[in-house]
């Protein structure tokens, strides 16, 4: 399983996330949140199927590039406490 803080290839060059046609506007708040959800859904699904979580790394990199650290920390605390509003 990829670590919640940093997957295996944490070091190195992280390119800017590519354009996502679902979020064409300059404000990338929704893009950040959606990639956070997609990452956690991907991890959950891959673990359930007993497969490698390596494909989930893309979502991890995107949300870590777009989201403020304080948001990510708060969302992780909410997931841990069972109060996160998103559907994972």
Swiss-Prot record:
Residues in CHCH domain copies: 29-75
Cellular component terms per the entry's GO annotation: mitochondrial crista; mitochondrion; respiratory chain complex IV
Subunit organization: Component of the cytochrome c oxidase (complex IV, CIV), a multisubunit enzyme composed of 14 subunits. The complex is composed of a catalytic core of 3 subunits MT-CO1, MT-CO2 and MT-CO3, encoded in the mitochondrial DNA, and 11 supernumerary subunits COX4I1 (or COX4I2), COX5A, COX5B, COX6A2 (or COX6A1), COX6B1 (or COX6B2), COX6C, COX7A1 (or COX7A2), COX7B, COX7C, COX8B and NDUFA4, which are encoded in the nuclear genome.
Annotated localization: Mitochondrion inner membrane
Disulfide bonding pattern of the chain: 32-67, 42-56
Matching Gene3D superfamilies: Cytochrome c oxidase, subunit VIb
Naturally occurring in which organism (per UniProt): Bos taurus
CDD domains referenced in this protein's UniProt entry, alphabetically: Cyt_c_Oxidase_VIb (cd00926)
Pfam families documented for this protein: COX6B (PF02297)
GO biological process terms, semicolon-separated: oxidative phosphorylation
The protein's name: Cytochrome c oxidase subunit 6B2
Motif (Cx9C motif): 32-42
Recorded topology in the membrane: Peripheral membrane protein
Metal-binding is among the record's keywords: no
Pathway the protein takes part in: Energy metabolism; oxidative phosphorylation
Family of the protein in this entry: Belongs to the cytochrome c oxidase subunit 6B family.
Top-level taxonomic group: Eukaryota
Motif segment (Cx10C motif): 56-67
Functional note: Component of the cytochrome c oxidase, the last enzyme in the mitochondrial electron transport chain which drives oxidative phosphorylation. The respiratory chain contains 3 multisubunit complexes succinate dehydrogenase (complex II, CII), ubiquinol-cytochrome c oxidoreductase (cytochrome b-c1 complex, complex III, CIII) and cytochrome c oxidase (complex IV, CIV), that cooperate to transfer electrons derived from NADH and succinate to molecular oxygen, creating an electrochemical gradient over the inner membrane that drives transmembrane transport and the ATP synthase.
């Amino acid at each position: 399983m990829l670590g919640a803080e940093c997957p295996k290839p944490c070091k190195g060059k992280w390119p800017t996330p590519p354009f996502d046609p679902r979020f064409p506007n300059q404000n990338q708040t929704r893009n950040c949140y959606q990639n956070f959800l997609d990452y956690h859904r991907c991890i959950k699904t891959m673990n359930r199927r007993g497969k490698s979580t390596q494909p989930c790394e893309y979502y991890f990199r995107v949300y870590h590039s777009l989201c403020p650290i304080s948001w990510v920390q708060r969302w992780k605390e909410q997931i841990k406490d069972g109060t996160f509003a998103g559907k994972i």
